[in-house]
Amino acid sequence: MIVRETRERPLSWRERVKTVPSWSLPFFALEWVWEWLAFLLSRWAFVVLLEYLGSLSILVAVFFYFHDSDNRVKQRHYQAWQVINTAQGKGGSGGRIEALQELNNDGVPLVGVDVSSAFLQGVHLGKARLLRSDFSAVDARNSDFKNADLQDSDLHTANFRESSFHKASLAGARLDDADLEGADLSDTDLSGSVLDNSDLRFAVLTNSKWRDIRSIKGANVYGVRTPPEGFLEWATQNGAIQMKADIDWAAARPKR
């Protein structure tokens, strides 16, 4: 809102001369000219109109900023997908950590995303919708996949050491040769998953849904923490191994 102050009419030159010392007249003359100019402009309707138009332009700019916010979000998402897709099949991060996290934070489904062979260490993808995604050969150590949906995803030969899959769904996922040492698989759905030759040493399996695991041949379950009742017996009966040292495990697991 514009608040206009009514300017008082300046003194005439004759009156002004009487109020200042004669030696300072040149300085006050310039000030007197500006006072009169300001007074005359304040009474000009066109100047008032310009002031209102200036305020209106600010309001219009604010309106269009918020009105166009959806387009800016779409553009941001498009750029994030470009980063992911152009780096497909390549090593390194290539900005994919930030791109994946941004899309997930905005609630964008990541169904079928292909980040195979990428370096994604420390990525935060809690609650991500990652059905049928390809994380094969990914290095995602110390990452967060809590409550994520990774059903029917390809995670074989990936490194998820010390990562959290608490309450995540790995149903039907391919996890053969995956490194899950020290990973948190508590309350995780492993139904139908393939865990052949996976490293489960010191993994947390509290309350995990393991009974319908498809295959666990050659997997190392040494030191598994809080395993569900009956899990270790079932695992060893179905080809799992309990070996602390890598060299012993390599010698004991089935040859391909």
Regions found by a protein language model. Name each.
Residues 23, 88-91, 100-256:
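Tandem repeat scaffolds
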